[in-house]
């Protein structure tokens, strides 16, 4: 049974009803509508922690979706799942691909920065200070880009940039 027919709670039911209304109202071709159904089911499965099912739906949506902006969000969600599973290199690939399609996606930029910062922390713990600093610098570059796009977000990142001397005057408003 498709996930959209297994609405177990009010939020899922509401989301499904709204999504179905949007699908009927938007002037989209059959392929785009089918891609959206897979994307919607992927988001629902992801919210339930059913990552394998979510990935299956997202991959199917990718085969159908042609719009670059919509594809960027599918790729972003795939990246989130891989990051959640500790597959940071895979997550980075999907986030980068999402940014290629949609450069104005601060959440993907932030997530890339978080991964590089995490890797920097691990390198520091392993006594690899030069590697840690290089990873921190990468994190800083991505956080600066995210902050430029969403200056009121990522306050902790802004503070980290200031504390570590990696901030620039033009980043903060």
Curated annotation (Swiss-Prot):
One of its GO terms (biological process) is photosynthesis. The keyword tRNA processing does not apply. It comes from the Bacteria. TPR repeats lie at residues 35-68, 72-105, 120-153. Pfam families: TPR_1 (PF00515). Signal peptide: none annotated. GO terms for cellular component: plasma membrane-derived thylakoid membrane. It is a peripheral membrane protein. Keywords: Membrane, Photosynthesis, Repeat, Thylakoid, TPR repeat. SUPFAM superfamilies: TPR-like (SSF48452). It is found in: Cellular thylakoid membrane. Its main location: membrane. Essential for the assembly of the photosystem I (PSI) complex. May act as a chaperone-like factor to guide the assembly of the PSI subunits. Belongs to the Ycf3 family. NCBIfam families: PRK02603.1. This is Photosystem I assembly protein Ycf3. It comes from Microcystis aeruginosa (strain NIES-843 / IAM M-2473). The lineage of its organism: Bacteria, Bacillati, Cyanobacteriota, Cyanophyceae, Oscillatoriophycideae. The gene is ycf3.
